[in-house]
């Protein structure tokens, strides 16, 4: 039973019952630069390291098509980690679908656009807008297909149909789309602050228009669950050899002192 104080099946826009005006994404160079600095430093200042596995899987995509990059959504940091991945590692233009964007309007100048789940008509407006943006193969749409925040490693993983709607309409309109799954987790290892773990799954290049939406959604759920389960086992068993350290924070002064003290020779005891 989920704790309703922490998690709810009701989307925030419905829960707060506040009308949200649809906001399109823009790509203002100044605000993109500002957002880069903010997002980069926020992650680097709050995590000991970011480790990434199978980074080169991203290069296996069909570069003639745009990209839908999808991940689990368990906490506030997921969007910031996604921003760092798209901008610093994948080097693409990011677009993010954000509920309650009216509370953070400045993000729209760096690639975010709003979705209002108060009604199906309002939600559809955002989905159609996403399809229009994905004409550009240099764009990556970062999305959380579960559609709502869930507890860490929550099972079963169930997708809402928004992502498959976007993907199938991109296939009809542009001939194809890359679906790139990202397993995302956070864990304390041997330091005082947590580390971020990212595994890039094999891209699914969707070009078939005949697959039913329900069948495609279930296929993507199974594939994504396998990826996330594998990552969870790797972390729990300490099997981290294949993870590349993308960044690692400098040790705080008291940790550096601790390491120096450990190197001091102990006096011999007769």
Model-derived regions, located:
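Conserved beta-strand termini and adjacent loop/short-helix elements that scaffold enzyme active sites
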Residues: 53-55, 97-99, 115-117, 182, ...
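Alpha-helical membrane-targeting segments
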Residues: 23-47, 102-111, 248-270
